[in-house]
Amino acid sequence: MIEKRPHTTVILAMSADGKIADFNRSPARFGSLNDKLHLEKQIAAVDAVLFGADTLRAYGTTMIISESILLQQRTKVNNHPQPVHIVISHSANLNPDIKFFQQPVRRWLLTTSGGASVWEKSSGFEQILVFETPQGEIDILAVVKYLASVEISRLAILGGGQLVASFLELDLIDEIWLTICPLILGGNTAPSPVGRKGFLSALAPGLQLLEVSTVEQEVFLHYGVIHKSELNLKSQIF
């Protein structure tokens, strides 16, 4: 595991059968007002939020802090009213007319050299960051090292499942917040919190339940991720 990187928390809402969207991948607006306030509180506690291009395309906007008490708390510690909002996309094929580009947030783009060329003459993003592997993919390890170097110490990942899987595979996630919402979506193609190929059960990331609460019809689960280094240490002890 990288020694210096942001403390990273995944924050997602899902149906009771573990889907973060329906089979049409429509915007997941099934969370209650309580879930919205929970998400806003978590966002207020971080320096940056990261989300994939498909998540942005689905919503057209990003979640901003609007609660006055949360804004005041950030101001007291000399933070910007809003965390940096970072889109990660290989192609950077984004509609410049979506509402996201009018929202009062600092926007960064994480992409490839090809994706950067799409936006190099636009003012849509405050920063365009290119970290590429020799295979032309986005270098996630280089990304988290860079974020730490610019004093982003706490990072929230807001989806989608492909992005969450990429970070889990590299053992870069520390906490997971899941809101279980009272509906069943079903569907073989409906996305889950963790996408890509998946993990064999013997190699699956382990979790430790930190807290659980029920608010009206929703259950809020807070997990800590057990890192591979912790598992290795335990195996050496026993």
Predicted region positions:
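Enzymes that bind and transform nitrogen-containing heteroaromatic metabolites
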Residues: 1-238
